[in-house]
């Protein structure tokens, strides 16, 4: 059944009401991240500028997101069903390369940090499938959505979003520039209200079969994009609504708005760092009291007794005492500063860190209270367990996203497309026709091979596995995260070893035998920048082989070093016409 404007307004009202609690929490988190604590805790402010304690909430969010995002996902595609094994494997390899190309086109490596921030801070990473509609052969890609703009309406039993809204406040001039000044929506609102407002709601609606875009009345005024403003209820009297794009079938295998709700005890959308806020609020409030106490102590008024001209008190003043038995007295009765309260502030900051498994060492404080390595291991273990939780959820979210991208590629792309990139460290270039290639099979599995570890720990684990013989050098390079093209790097490492053997062993031996010409030619080729060391080495080796092959059969054997023999044999055996060292030429010919 096609969505109507009245149905959209009903869903809009429901979405705003049902997501109100989570949007309030998102607003609070945004303001704490921006150090606008006076908007969150207005009764605990000394100044209107900055918090009084360390913003461990921001530190934890950025550190945890960066650590989790440092490990890139693995994309695995099973063989196609009902195909010969060789053809199925070939199609699976091409499917994987297409998925890799879609990930690169979505800038997933840079977007991943933002997705993890949304997971830790808001508990709702979200994206939308989109493409450049002016280019028929353009590749679809993921657009990361701000969680405060996403309003889930219905979820599937497996946790996928079935229906949702994207609600954003936008300027009228921007909407006209994007949708065109002749769009019927603007004409309809102008006729119904007699004017156009400065700000409007842009509402994207989507379910599993259709999507559409509408415009509606919004609170007026300009706020920063990070400040959440509750949308006007669509059911209020006088609200103006119209379709910017009429609802139409999107032909995808699910809702084009993609979101993943982080598991919580009460089923609400909430960030994993929310437990930090109560102790952080106490630390902030207590530190304000300590600051006020210190300020009173610094600016305490002097106490002047039995002084005749007390009103002249000040710099370089001469004071006269009152005659009588009492002595003149000038005192500074400052209240004692409660410095022990600073320890309570630190305790609350530590409680905020501990509530989300964020050791103080991660924030740059080495700490002096760690008595043993076991304590450090336990702290890091709690940190890593939450990282593993985030990566598991992100793998599930990515799997849904890539399946949706594959369907969009089949349904929305016209003609063939060339793709290129790196697959398991190997550069590739392929051409395929999306409408004929997918055939409704969008199966893909996204995983993280190093759950709960950061890039440094992952590198240490890969190195240890390589030393123990559990991994080949190429696989270790791929899992290290440092080598973009393991196949090319493996070749470079091998050639580097050969060049080192040439320079350190073969050339010195040839010079000792009196062959200084090869030595001179090698370094002249390098010094002139005409050849790389590897190319110069290969050229001179080829020259040596040709000289040996041109010698008559009864000539004395050439002076070939064991090192050169080893290098040549490793390249595919002895050159034709070159007898082994120590064997007469006649015997070699028999």
Residue ranges and their predicted role:
Residues 10-13, 130-335, 339:
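Structured, contiguous alpha/beta core segments that scaffold functional sites
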Residues 93, 97-108, 118-121, 125, ...:
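A broad, structural surface signal
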Residues 4, 90-101, 107-115, 185, ...:
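Exposed alpha-helical structural elements
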Residues 1-193, 347, 380, 396, ...:
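Extended, helix-rich architectural segments
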Residues 82-90, 102-115, 166, 267-278, ...:
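Generic amphipathic alpha-helical segments used as scaffolds and interaction surfaces in large
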Residues 2-8, 12-14, 303-590:
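C-terminal anchoring/interaction modules
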